């Protein structure tokens, strides 16, 4: 979420406060041979083995990407509109404005012997989608002077790193910076960006080879990253923050970018010109109301009264829950038939993500017409064995939760209310923060 001087910000320390949130799910024998992953530490990093990389190099690579992604490849605050040299969250859409792939885009340093205009980029995407995205990219290549290549296994490694106790300024890293990476003393072969999908969510880094992340970070910089955790713990942390990732959660050619929170996550630049899928996205942003959004959910059994009030779910690795199949409909417990309240997207243990009708499953009011929400209303997901390929049917209750930053973004009208902010001043402030970070690193 982009902040302005008139908008309250949420620091990382507030997110890490202990929340007492009880569930009454029966603790039974494990329903699978794999135990739930442990809770994520306050500081740590994870190797994202479920992500793949595509290289795009050539003199036309920047203009080519500008016409395909939701993010702006140019620095709009500069009258010369130079090419952005920072990584960012973005998405590829189809012509109907639906998501093909959520992605991260990273610049690579200029290779020796190439012209200054010959930029190189890495696209990070769901590993199972690399072939499909590469096909999409080749379809739009036409006569553009560039090369496309899927990176080999082990050629580079994708990492997520976080420090829940870190200063809020890390979340203010500006996409218009001229720096390749917010990590000033990193090796020239390392690229990365701040992960803007939730306040204080952490950083994304790409390193060469398969070695440990800290081997690529010199001196004190490498000491503050904590210890490596497995992919499961990263997934838990991501779902606790309500961050969907990959096409098992952001369904290809079905999900809409605003319903997937890409506007709130700074993955869309509404000021940029034409790109594939822009029309529906811009029209919804300016004239429509986003009635559904992806939210974190708490899975439980028993009564709703056993759940204490909170704005984020609480993960308990000892709780075993049989998860519904992805895409299962959410309905009211009291209703046999009626309008679907949303769709379950995925989960780990007793937490998950769901696409929720806000005015039905939460107290968020989008218009002045009132809502269908009742604090006593319970919701469930029911499924049959035929849906998940098993011989058994199942049912689990869930409660949608609205993180504080999501509620604030919606109540403020999102970026529409912030259109009058001083973008030049914001860019200058971010550059000053980067310079301060570089000075601190060099003085250590």
Curated annotation (Swiss-Prot):
One of its GO terms (cellular component) is mitochondrial matrix. GO terms for molecular function: transferase activity. One of its GO terms (biological process) is iron-sulfur cluster assembly. It is found in: Mitochondrion matrix. Keywords: Mitochondrion, Transit peptide. It comes from the Eukaryota. Residues 26-45 are annotated as: Disordered. The keyword Transit peptide applies. Residues 1-28 form a transit peptide. The keyword Mitochondrion applies. Belongs to the GcvT family. CAF17/IBA57 subfamily. This is Iron-sulfur cluster assembly factor IBA57 homolog, mitochondrial.
